[in-house]
């Protein structure tokens, strides 16, 4: 069993297309799960949603997807981006985001399951950062069923793998807005092999200059901040 995990596309259609092209070359992929944060903060929110709707994949909801369909009140800069994004995706796109589930469980007939969430199994906001201490992990993960052998997620935009009490934790990184000092698009492949889940992190080059040009020309408010994040790939 091989499952691809994409997360945090953030309206970056160029990066998404590059990842899908790389993914098409990987053998034995049985399913794709997109772990939320689909369209806010990037130049092509509608194009990203249109692409995802054509794919044979599962898509779950992220925190900024919630912001878009709920029109959650934020500071004036973020509110401007939310309003612009809603205008781009229209009522159909807003309804699509609202209908997305919180999580996706991949049942494994040969062993433990894979659970995919956006940030953590309890909410869409608190990040599972690599340095999280045991007591906090217990709070966020301690009630997962024993049948869960791997947890895949995004939200933090930093790709990493660690184990906690036998549970494989995999942050797929960000497809469209990495922040781990690597400007390449990120995704992960989880494989059930030798009675255990294993993770492979993949990085894919894409035309960053084209995305910067799109951001400058698309009319999205506060685009300069997004350009800085894309070109520096860090917090």
How would you label these PLM feature ranges?
Residues 1-4, 105-115, 164-168, 197-198:
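Beta-strand-turn-beta hairpins that frame and shape the catalytic cleft
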Residues 2-98:
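Core catalytic region of metal-dependent phosphoesterases/phosphodiesterases
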Residues 10-15, 40-43, 64-70, 124, ...:
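Active-site environment of divalent metal-dependent phosphoester hydrolases
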Residues 26-28, 89-161:
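His/acidic metal-ligating clusters that form di-metal
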Residues 31, 127-131, 138, 166-168, ...:
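Metallo-beta-lactamase
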Residues 57, 147-150, 197-199:
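Short active-site oxyanion
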Residues 163-235:
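Acidic, His/Gly-rich catalytic cores of divalent-metal-dependent hydrolytic chemistry
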């Amino acid at each position: 069993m091989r499952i691809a995990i994409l997360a945090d596309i953030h309206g970056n259609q160029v990066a998404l297309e590059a990842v899908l092209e790389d993914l098409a070359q990987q053998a034995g992929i049985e399913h794709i799960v997109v772990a939320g944060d689909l369209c806010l903060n990037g130049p092509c929110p509608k194009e990203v949603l249109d692409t995802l709707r054509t794919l044979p994949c599962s898509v779950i909801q992220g925190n900024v997807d919630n912001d878009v369909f709920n029109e959650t009140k934020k500071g004036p800069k973020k509110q401007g981006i939310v309003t612009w994004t809603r205008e781009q995706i229209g009522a159909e796109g807003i309804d699509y985001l609202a209908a997305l589930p919180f999580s996706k469980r991949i049942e494994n007939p040969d062993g433990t399951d894979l659970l995919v969430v956006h940030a953590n199994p309890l909410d869409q906001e608190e990040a599972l950062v690599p340095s999280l201490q045991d007591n906090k992990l217990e709070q966020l993960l301690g009630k997962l069923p024993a049948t869960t052998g791997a947890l895949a997620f995004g939200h933090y935009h930093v790709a990493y793998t660690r184990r906690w009490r036998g549970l494989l934790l995999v942050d797929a990184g960000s497809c469209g807005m990495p922040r781990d000092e690597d400007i390449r698009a990120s995704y992960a492949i989880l494989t059930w092999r030798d009675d255990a889940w294993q993770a492979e992190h993949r990085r894919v080059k894409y035309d960053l200059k084209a995305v910067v040009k799109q951001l400058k020309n698309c009319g999205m408010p506060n685009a300069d901040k997004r350009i800085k994040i894309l070109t520096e790939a860090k917090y």
